[in-house]
């Protein structure tokens, strides 16, 4: 009887180890967007809207209307530090990251002020990455509108 119980425990343990390993492989397989496809200097060359009218959003990133980001330059380093510079001369330091949620890659950033550390900032902004091929980057910011959701779509080109 002890041999049967021991065999069952051993079989269950082996099954748990195999299942745990295969799950981690599936998670990493969906996370194929590396920092290399996002690092560099980017220019916002167009802003479009999906599911919402163009004038539905008055302010994005607590900075101004989406149109102020047209032509802006985003510099993203591999360390996660970065800046964006608007065409009106405004420059904002940020800390950015990539993560995959339910198989969908997301770009997140926190705005940094003088000598402020990203770990001390609780709020930030998250956009879905719908394209990142190393030369073009498309970020979709979700927006609640009326009884549904829409998106502000930022199309960036690498400089």
Regions found by a protein language model. Give the residues of each.
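Lipid interaction determinants
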Residues: 21-95, 99-159
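Bacterial Sec-dependent N-terminal signal peptides
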Residues: 1-33
């Amino acid at each position: 009887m002890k041999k049967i119980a021991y065999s069952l425990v051993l079989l269950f343990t082996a099954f748990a180890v195999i299942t745990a390993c295969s799950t981690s492989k599936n998670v990493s397989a969906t996370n194929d967007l590396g920092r290399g496809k996002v690092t560099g200097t980017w220019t916002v060359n167009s802003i479009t809207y999906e599911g919402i009218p163009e004038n539905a959003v008055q302010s994005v990133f607590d900075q101004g209307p989406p149109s102020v980001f047209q032509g802006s330059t985003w510099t993203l380093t591999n360390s996660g530090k970065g800046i964006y510079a608007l065409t009106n001369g405004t420059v904002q330091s940020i800390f950015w990251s990539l993560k995959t949620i339910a198989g969908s890659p997301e770009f997140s950033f926190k705005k940094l002020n003088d000598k402020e550390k990203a770990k001390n900032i609780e709020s930030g902004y998250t956009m879905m990455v719908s394209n990142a091929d190393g030369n073009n980057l498309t970020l979709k910011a979700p927006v609640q509108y009326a009884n549904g959701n829409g998106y502000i779509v930022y199309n960036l080109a690498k400089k």
